[in-house]
Amino acid sequence: VVKKGIENLGFMVETPMSVRYLEEIQNYAKFLSVGTNDLWSLYTGKSRGSSDIREQVNERFGEVLKEILQKSMVPVSVCGALASDEEGLKFLLKLGYRSFSVSPSFFVRAVEIVEDFDG
């Protein structure tokens, strides 16, 4: 990939299988982006849009998200609705995540939450 002038190719962690093979994936990816919407949906069997985003703030899904951080050897960020929710962002910060993509309407509040985070 570098031969083609692309030095930073990342991988979206959105499926249980991608979590399972994370070590191998990182042999090629320079960074990871955790897609919480699809990942949560596939772990629970629920439709992406069928429930309140705060259902993702729970110990069981937290264990999956912690596993990703523990296995990561490259920078990891979170995208998806969980990072653009006040309780969701606090949850992710407590788990150890430090890089997020958030919606434009939530950006200012996200900055405030991160600045106020004590951890």
Each model region followed by its residue ranges:
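Conserved alpha/beta-domain cores
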Residues: V1-G119
